[in-house]
Amino acid sequence: MPFSDADLIARVLAREDHNAFGELVRRHQSPVRAFLARMARGDAHLADDLAQETFLKAWKKLHTFRGNARFSTWLFGIAFNEFRDFVRRRKELALEDADNLPNEPATARDGLLRLDLTEALKRLSSNERAAVVLCCQNGLSHEEVSQVLDCPLGTVKTNILRGKDKLRRLLAPAYKNYESAGN
């Protein structure tokens, strides 16, 4: 029977068990990397670097994990903070708010209007994107997203609502073209 996250954390804290921490990394690296890739607008190398920093910080700060939330929620919080710190350090990656972008819903490719979810997510503000990805892709509750992003619950709900509304507007033309092509 596999150990729970709580059991593995206890083993790491009791005897600095590297194998136990390695198992925590194996369990959580894919969702953390996917979240960071979405936040980094698809830059896999940046996502990998930030994920590595996330797990290094988790190793160093594991003693601060209180168990009030799931381990994955705590880990996503570290990942989001790593991303936010990176953006602060590298102003050229500062993300524009989708409201400041042109109203063109998609780009033409091979004569067809297309906009996939990845491209649409890039057009959301970083706060909207983080809230939508954590809630819809990673399955966190609004309360957990509030903890991860360290913002009020109402702000999370607003960011999710606005993000979903923008995604609907951005993806509607692509979906109509997909449907009219007989798919």
Predicted region positions:
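Short, charged helix-capping/linker segments at alpha-helix termini
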Residues: 13-23, 33-53, 176
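Arg/Lys-rich amphipathic alpha helix in sigma70-family domain 2
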Residues: 60-67, 77-97, 162
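Internal acidic/polar
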Residues: 2-7, 85, 91-119, 141, ...
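Helix-turn-helix DNA-binding module
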Residues: 119-130, 138-155
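Residues within the DNA-recognition helix of helix-turn-helix
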Residues: 28, 159-162, 166
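Structural recognition of an alpha-helix C-terminal capping motif at a helix-to-coil junction
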Residues: 49-56, 69-81
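C-terminal edge and immediately downstream basic/flexible tail or linker adjoining helix-turn-helix-like DNA-binding
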Residues: 42, 147-148, 165-183
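Short helix-capping/turn signature of helix-turn-helix
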Residues: 27-30, 38-40, 133-140
